[in-house]
Regions:
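Recognition helix of helix-turn-helix/homeodomain-like DNA-binding domains
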Residues: 26-40
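DNA major-groove recognition helix of helix-turn-helix/homeodomain DNA-binding modules
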Residues: 44-57
Length: 57
């Protein structure tokens, strides 16, 4: 569910994995792993994602 929402929101906002990685201070590979469901971001990164996409947690 998280991975699907992340992909959908990123595409809706027309951002690349690189764009999100730069805003969060992580690697593009980290974003790719989140979108693949291999790992999930910590709470601080989730809060930052919510701010970027203007959604609530």
């Amino acid at each position: 569910m998280f991975k699907d929402n992340l992909i959908q929101l990123r595409k809706y906002h027309r951002l690349t994995q690189e764009d999100i990685a730069e805003k969060l201070g992580v690697t593009r590979q980290a974003i790719a792993k989140w979108e693949a469901g291999e790992t999930i971001p910590d709470l601080d990164k989730c809060k930052m994602l919510a701010e970027i996409f203007e959604v609530s947690l």
